[in-house]
Regions:
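Short alpha-helical
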Residues: 13, 45-47, 69, 73
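N-terminal first-folded block
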Residues: 2-40
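Short, well-ordered beta-strand segments in beta-rich or mixed alpha/beta enzyme
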Residues: 2-9, 39-66
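Glycine-rich beta-strand-turn "strand-cap" elements at beta-sheet edges
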Residues: 2, 40-48, 76-100
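An amphipathic, aromatic/His-enriched active-site/gating alpha helix that lines ligand/cofactor pockets
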Residues: 24-36, 55-89
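Intrinsic disorder/low-complexity signal
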Residues: 16, 53-54, 91-94
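Short acidic, gly/pro-rich beta-turn/loop elements at beta-sheet edges
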Residues: 16-18, 48-50, 62, 98-100
């Protein structure tokens, strides 16, 4: 499994626009083969930071996501509210289970 997690700086005054774009992207992405989770949220300590968390079956599914039509649409919208470079990492996970 591939996990993607990170953050990007945004103009927090555009929270409604950001939320609408993120929700549209989430709905479309969850329909992709191999997408297990796809979430955006505002950081609780900084209204100018959006956090992203994704779970993918494998690298192939994630690679296909990058060329999906809704990804291009989302990237065009992101330019209207992102204020800097994102910090996003990819992790290969070999095991997943409940926290003990």
């Amino acid at each position: 499994m591939i996990v993607v997690a990170g953050a990007f700086p945004v103009d927090g005054s555009k929270a409604t626009e950001i939320t609408d774009a993120a929700n549209t992207m989430r709905v479309a992405t969850l329909q992709e083969d191999g997408c297990h989770e796809y979430r955006f949220s505002f950081a609780t300590d900084d209204p100018n930071t959006v956090l992203v968390f994704e779970e993918w079956r494998d690298q192939e599914a994630l690679t296909k996501h990058f060329v999906a039509p809704h990804m291009a649409e989302f990237q065009a919208k992101v330019g209207t509210f992102v204020t800097g470079a994102p910090t996003i990492s990819r992790y290969e996970v070999t095991d997943k289970g409940p926290l003990r």
